[in-house]
Every structure is written in C-alpha cells, then in structure tokens.
C-alpha cells in the first residue's frame, strides 16, 4: 500500500546531524508534523512544537520527552501573526535560537469547483497553508541570517506543481509555497541559510485520514476527492510517514544544501541529486517553469 524507501534517503552524511540544534515544527499535534518532530528529536534536536489543538499537541510533547528528548509545546494558530510571534519568542527563549524551521501546518480546504465553494472557506484554506508559512519564516530569518546558519523546509505538494481539480485552494497555496521557496533561496544566497520545498508523498495520515476513515460523504465533490485518495493509496501510490519524515530530516540536517530552492519529493534519490547539483542549477531544474515547444 505504501512506497518503499528510495535509495539515498535514510542516511545523514557524517557531520550533518542535529545534535545541539533547535527545530520548530508547525502543525505538530498530529499526522506528519508529529512524525517529523519525533524524527528531529531522534536526530538530537531540541524541538519546539506549534499547533492549534492543545490536547494533541501536549501528547506530542509528552511522547518526545518520554523518549528523552527536549520539547516545548506552544498552542498557536499560525494564521495569527501575533500568536506566531509569541510562539517563536517562547520557543527561542526556552530552547535557544531556532536553527531549523519545518513549515508543516496546513489544511486541504473546501472541495468543489471554484464557482461552487464558499469564498470565505477558499480564502481560509489559502491562509492556513500560506500565511502561516510566511509568518513563521519572516520571524526566524533575521536570527538565522545574523548567525549565518539555518534551514527551512516547506512541506508542499505535487498538487502545487501540477493540479488537483476540486481542491483548488490547496493546489494554489502549495504552488505559492513552492515559488516562495525558490524566491527566498535566491534572496538568501550567501547568507548561510537554505530553504527547500518538500513533497512528502500521499500519506495515509493527516489530510488523507478523513478520506480513509469517514463514511461516504453526501457532497459529490468531496466523495470524488476521497475516492481518488483511497484508490491511490490502495494501488500503492502513497508514501510511508516514517519515510517522509526521514526525507524531511535529511533536508534539515544539511547535506542537501546545494539543492536550496528546489522542489523535491520523497520519491527522489537525494544522493543522485546532490551529485548532480551543478547540472540541476545550470539547467534550472526542479522548479516551476512553463514548458515550451
């Protein structure tokens, strides 16, 4: 049902661990965010956890500390700039300056054709996916740049690189995040800070979980989207959450810095891409571009 581990993914190169570093993960109360937080803690990082749901977020923190990790949980809505600023300040004060930011918080948004969905719901999904990423990134960058050290991983989606009919808000937001990653990489060149767009694959947790566990929805658009998700996972086109977390961990750990600004996926062989980094840069690959004749 799930993809196997791609070659070149699991190992972090010597000297590129996260011991002594501070990582901040948004959307850390459940799903992929929780799995990523656990992977970061396992690599030696102290982890700041941010999410809206206080109860599940506390469970994530308890899980990490029970394993011997250092973790701080802060309840905050990433679409609220003041709440984000307070969360970043609290994590930095208690754990130290943030070295790694994982922008994972997001929402699928309304399902349906654009002219049929509620405009407010559509824009709310854009904010949940994009505004939080921008707010968190803006807040951690000054310290990273001053220290000439930092890595940011934006959890995006192939929906932003291609299309996802009936899920336009999510696809548009993810496309914006992919382009934000590319633009920031150019702005951050020579600062010591790198940034990546990371597609974790279609997972059986998080945004897909409702499709797997809910009864058949009455809304035709939602039913169609859920049916597609179930079919893709049943046909083995998904990814394992632990594999996805190790993919993100490798980007955060430093040995992929030559790929800064690129849109990468869990199915990529990172060792091969690192070896081809000069060619990738020369031909401007792994970015969003218009295909021409």
Range-by-range predicted roles:
Residues 22, 29-30:
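Conserved glycine-rich cofactor-binding loop
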Residues 108-123, 166-169:
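Conserved mid-core segment of classical short-chain dehydrogenase/reductases
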Residues 115-134, 149, 153, 177:
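Catalytic Tyr-X3-Lys loop
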């Amino acid at each position: 049902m799930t993809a196997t581990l791609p070659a070149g993914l699991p190992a972090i190169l010597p000297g590129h661990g996260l011991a002594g570093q501070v990582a901040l993960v948004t959307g850390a109360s459940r799903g992929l965010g929780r799995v990523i937080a656990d992977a970061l803690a396992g690599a030696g990082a102290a982890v700041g956890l941010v999410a809206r749901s206080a109860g599940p977020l506390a469970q994530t923190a308890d899980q990490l500390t029970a394993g011997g990790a250092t973790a701080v949980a802060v309840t905050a809505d990433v679409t609220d700039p003041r709440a984000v600023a307070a969360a970043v300040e609290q994590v930095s004060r208690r754990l130290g300056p943030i070295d790694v930011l994982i922008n994972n918080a997001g929402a699928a948004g309304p399902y349906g054709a654009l002219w049929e969905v509620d405009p407010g719901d559509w824009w709310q999904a854009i904010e949940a996916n994009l505004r939080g990423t921008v707010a968190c990134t803006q807040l951690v960058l000054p310290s990273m740049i001053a220290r000439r050290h930092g890595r940011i991983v934006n959890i995006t989606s192939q929906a932003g690189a291609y299309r996802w009919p009936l899920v336009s808000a999510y696809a548009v937001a993810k496309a914006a995040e992919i382009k934000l990653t590319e633009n920031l990489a150019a702005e951050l060149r020579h600062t010591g800070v790198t940034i990546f767009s990371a597609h974790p694959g279609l997972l059986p947790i998080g945004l897909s979980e409702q499709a797997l566990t809910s009864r058949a929805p009455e809304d035709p658009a939602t039913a169609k989207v859920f049916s597609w998700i179930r079919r893709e996972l049943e046909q083995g086109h998904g990814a394992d959450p632990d594999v996805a977390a190790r993919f993100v961990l490798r980007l955060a750990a430093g040995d992929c810095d030559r790929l800064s600004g690129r849109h990468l996926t869990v199915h990529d062989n990172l060792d091969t891409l690192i070896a081809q980094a000069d060619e990738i840069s020369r031909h401007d690959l792994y970015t969003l571009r218009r295909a021409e004749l």
